[in-house]
């Protein structure tokens, strides 16, 4: 059940879309460096994919992974948040590299997503492929962060599985599709 999100003058912003759809859209709008976001209801995993404009060397990936593990360890220790499963992998394909971060939704927080995003941006900066969105104002950023936090909480509490959804950006638009390759009828 979606909660209202605090908005202007004590009003509440309520989202009518499915929880996972709202989460995917807000993540893609809030973090323009994200190429795609997938929610897998079976495993309750969120897959965050970033694209680099050139292939990634194994050593550079291992260094990024080491820094990320260290940063997350410090984050969990200082914040007191429960440390969940986070798997990071990469794939070189032609002239690009794809970095996938899989996170367990049951323990994931908005702050953790922000940290992961910031670590990717700090490490790969100009190499990240990003659709430059209009700069969101501080208030809009806060609204999307509140939506993300609320949708994560809703997914943690939900006992009904949603559909597997994938969202990505194309020509300035955010698109979300039902994606279940195991049940395609050919």
Task: Please report, for each region that a protein language model flagged, where it lies by residue.
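Structured domain cores in non-transmembrane regions
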Residues: 55-112
């Amino acid at each position: 059940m979606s909660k209202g999100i605090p908005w202007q003058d004590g009003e509440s912003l309520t989202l009518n879309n499915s929880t996972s759809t709202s989460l995917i859209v807000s993540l893609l709008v809030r973090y323009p460096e994200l190429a795609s976001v997938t929610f897998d209801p079976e495993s309750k995993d969120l897959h965050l994919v970033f694209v680099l404009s050139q292939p990634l060397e194994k050593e550079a990936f291992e260094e990024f992974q080491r820094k990320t593990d260290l940063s997350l360890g410090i984050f969990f220790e200082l914040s007191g948040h429960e440390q969940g499963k986070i798997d990071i992998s990469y794939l070189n394909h032609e002239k690009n590299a794809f970095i996938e971060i899989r996170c367990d939704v049951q323990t994931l927080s908005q702050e953790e997503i922000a940290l992961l995003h910031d670590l990717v941006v700090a490490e790969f900066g100009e190499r990240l492929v990003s659709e430059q969105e209009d700069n969101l104002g501080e208030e809009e950023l806060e609204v999307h962060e509140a939506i993300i936090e609320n949708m994560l909480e809703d997914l943690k509490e939900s006992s009904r599985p949603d559909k597997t959804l994938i969202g990505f950006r194309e020509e300035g638009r955010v698109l979300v599709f039902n994606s279940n390759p195991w049940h395609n009828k050919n």
